[in-house]
């Protein structure tokens, strides 16, 4: 079931300048989530998801001309932020399934490919969790809490990545006079890679070609053969628009990575292994503070899995400052303490599926990081051999430690 928002509510725009709101209403797919407590149990929430602004059509007001070209913003329509906002209109998405997003109750499936007009189209959908109001993002404060979800990764071959992570995006998506669309239309994305998000940044025109930096907690980057989780601290709070060389020093793009295979547990995760990817998996991530309070300093990130009524612990040690001490820049950029500060302020859940045309996902599942061969991650190989690749996330819940799962 989908939640329809009137076009007059808000507009979306690719991470930069949000334009005016068009006439096509946004139709957010509902994704039921759960808030859990030690005493009260888990209570359902009427939340939904929204596609990133870059998936939306943004065009000249009163015309069909796109406000972007193959090389970025159309300079005749968007010479600056203010003019761009006045000239351009963002339209809603009515059919999320055509973008590879399908929902059913408390489950969401993301598809990499879809046959359109007789040809296979690559989709790579990325969606953000909206609060029950459908206007702002759901920002979770997870210090001394846990975040849990079920995942079916069985249809993700080598070279694919079905990800669920947290981003310190603004709750409103950067809503402003120049960005009336805001979170309702998927504006405001940022992560620790500080990549240039394209024509838009925080819902405004990205006329400077800035990168969008913010703290990122990768809860789950995985396919059926390999998995990692990793915190990525930054020296700044919230979205920071970087330029030039500073884009490589604001955040820890590498992060402190926990990869069971890389740590020597080669028979731990995969088809028919200890964590069996042929079956649905319950993934639990706990953010433990030094004093076991919601205001304490993040001291440890624990991971456990539940399958067929059994709890499966970490394959090796837990993630602590000591574990992360050898990471490239993790400690210098604030380490677990800085990551914990972002978790305390609140972070937005992000769901995505993608391939890797540049590195073929070797950093996740090959070259010592996993068992995949050197050519299995080639996107052309994946499309030819696994056209139905997809990931399903379900039963997303968060709350007090040990309150979100049972055995």
Swiss-Prot record:
Family matches, as InterPro entries: ConA-like_dom_sf, Glyco_hydro_7, Glyco_hydro_7_sf
EC number: 3.2.1.4
GO CC terms in record: extracellular region
Keyword set, alphabetical order: Carbohydrate metabolism, Cellulose degradation, Glycoprotein, Glycosidase, Hydrolase, Polysaccharide degradation, Secreted, Signal
Swiss-Prot/TrEMBL catalytic activity: Endohydrolysis of (1->4)-beta-D-glucosidic linkages in cellulose, lichenin and cereal beta-D-glucans
Main location: secreted
Glycosylation site list: 136
GO biological process per UniProt: cellulose catabolic process; glucan catabolic process
Keyword Signal annotated: yes
EC primary class: hydrolase
One Pfam entry name: Glyco_hydro_7
Residues at the active site: 216, 221
Signal peptide boundaries: 1-18
Annotated localization: Secreted
Single GO MF descriptor: cellulase activity
Family according to the record: Belongs to the glycosyl hydrolase 7 (cellulase C) family.
PANTHER family, sorted: 1,4-BETA-D-GLUCAN CELLOBIOHYDROLASE B (PTHR33753), ENDO-BETA-1,4-GLUCANASE CELB (PTHR33753:SF1)
Function: Has endoglucanase activity on substrates containing beta-1,4 glycosidic bonds, like in carboxymethylcellulose (CMC), hydroxyethylcellulose (HEC) and beta-glucan. Involved in the degradation of complex natural cellulosic substrates.
Annotated protein name in UniProt: Probable endo-beta-1,4-glucanase celB
Organism for this UniProt entry: Aspergillus fumigatus (strain ATCC MYA-4609 / CBS 101355 / FGSC A1100 / Af293)
Taxonomic classification: Eukaryota, Fungi, Dikarya, Ascomycota, Pezizomycotina
Name of the gene: celB
